[in-house]
């Protein structure tokens, strides 16, 4: 790596491959966090976009392959795995979703597998993919992050998609009047029309904050846990470059131990994101508040 200090190494691994408009008016890649910041809102994290799309395609190809090879006879290992996964997700939907919609189970399955695959990239040694990017581009300073869920843009994008579905189903099931009433007539109510009118701003403030908190908490929970996990891997990798034999040996042990524990984290975070999506959409399908 071009960065010789521990801080430079860490900063390089925590920076996205950002493409946007440079100060000179041209378009190109940012080679530092300062350059990426100057690009503003319309900068693109190409590593996040690329890995998200690639892993989504891998998910589709695996399940398509399993569907083509599905048989009523002796199932293969892939078919068994997919069937167990589908039954697990379907059971989770039946337990937590109290409405009727053919979309929820496929959506939950997509979220769980897709988020899990994006999280699982964190198990790849931290230097492998950045070094591969350097070999391909020939640019020793180019940053490249492979774990899409450590980018708040990715987690917030998924959370906003779920939020859009919450709004859509709330209006579809309850009607626009019911949706507005849910935001303005609860949690405080009164039979006195004048008092109820006074309570509308208070109710709206409370319910609006609760509504907005759903996508924000959904995004930040996944981002925070995965970002912290990646940072631990990077800090452990710094031990290998310390030049001290005993510290490098400790790094090997810690790397293995954290990787084993991290398997639980990446699975749990995918499950939590899926379950919260199911619960939020179930609440959107409820007729009464």
UniProtKB/Swiss-Prot annotation:
Subunit structure: F-type ATPases have 2 components, CF(1) - the catalytic core - and CF(0) - the membrane proton channel. CF(1) has five subunits: alpha(3), beta(3), gamma(1), delta(1), epsilon(1). CF(0) has three main subunits: a(1), b(2) and c(9-12). The alpha and beta chains form an alternating ring which encloses part of the gamma chain. CF(1) is attached to CF(0) by a central stalk formed by the gamma and epsilon chains, while a peripheral stalk is formed by the delta and b chains.
Protein name as annotated: ATP synthase subunit a
Subcellular locations according to the entry: Cell inner membrane
Topology of this chain in the membrane: Multi-pass membrane protein
GO cellular component, one term: plasma membrane
PROSITE patterns according to UniProt: ATPASE_A (PS00449)
Recorded family membership: Belongs to the ATPase A chain family.
Alphabetical list of Pfam families matching this protein: ATP-synt_A
SUPFAM superfamilies: F1F0 ATP synthase subunit A
Functional description taken from the UniProt entry: Key component of the proton channel; it plays a direct role in the translocation of protons across the membrane.
Phylogenetic lineage: Bacteria, Pseudomonadati, Pseudomonadota, Gammaproteobacteria, Pseudomonadales
Native species: Pseudomonas fluorescens (strain SBW25)
GO MF term (any one): proton-transporting ATP synthase activity, rotational mechanism
UniProt main location, coarse: membrane
Domain of life: Bacteria
Protein keywords: ATP synthesis, Cell inner membrane, Cell membrane, CF(0), Hydrogen ion transport, Ion transport, Membrane, Transmembrane, Transmembrane helix, Transport
TM segment ranges: 43-63, 104-124, 160-180, 193-213, 232-252, 259-279
One GO process term, biological-process aspect: proton motive force-driven plasma membrane ATP synthesis
């Amino acid at each position: 790596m071009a960065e010789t200090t521990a801080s430079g190494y860490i900063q390089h691994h925590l920076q996205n491959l950002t493409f946007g408009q440079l100060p000179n008016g041209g378009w190109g890649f940012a080679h530092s966090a300062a350059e990426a910041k100057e690009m503003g809102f319309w900068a693109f994290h190409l590593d996040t976009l690329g890995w998200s799309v690639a892993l989504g395609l891998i998910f589709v190809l695996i399940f398509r392959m399993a569907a083509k090879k599905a048989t009523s006879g002796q199932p293969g290992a892939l078919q068994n795995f997919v069937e167990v996964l589908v039954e697990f997700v379907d059971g989770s939907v039946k337990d937590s979703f109290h409405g009727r919609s053919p979309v929820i189970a496929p959506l939950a399955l997509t979220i769980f597998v897709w988020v899990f695959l994006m999280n699982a990239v964190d198990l790849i040694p931290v230097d492998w993919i950045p070094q591969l990017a350097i070999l391909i581009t020939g640019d020793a300073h180019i940053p490249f992050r492979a774990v899409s869920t450590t980018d708040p843009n990715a987690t917030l994008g998924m959370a906003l998609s779920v939020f859009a579905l919450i709004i859509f189903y709330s209006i579809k099931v309850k009607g626009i009047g019911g949706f507005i009433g849910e935001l303005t007539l609860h949690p405080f109510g009164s039979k006195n029309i004048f008092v109820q009118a006074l309570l509308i701003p208070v109710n709206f403030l409370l319910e609006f904050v609760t509504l907005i908190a759903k996508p924000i908490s959904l995004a930040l929970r996944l981002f925070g846990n995965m970002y912290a996990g990646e940072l631990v891997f990077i800090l452990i990798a710094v031990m290998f470059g310390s030049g001290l034999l005993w510290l490098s040996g400790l790094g090997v042990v810690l790397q293995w131990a954290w990787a084993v524990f991290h398997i639980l984290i990446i699975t749990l975070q995918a499950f939590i994101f899926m379950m919260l999506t199911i619960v939020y959409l179930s609440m959107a399908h409820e007729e009464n508040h």
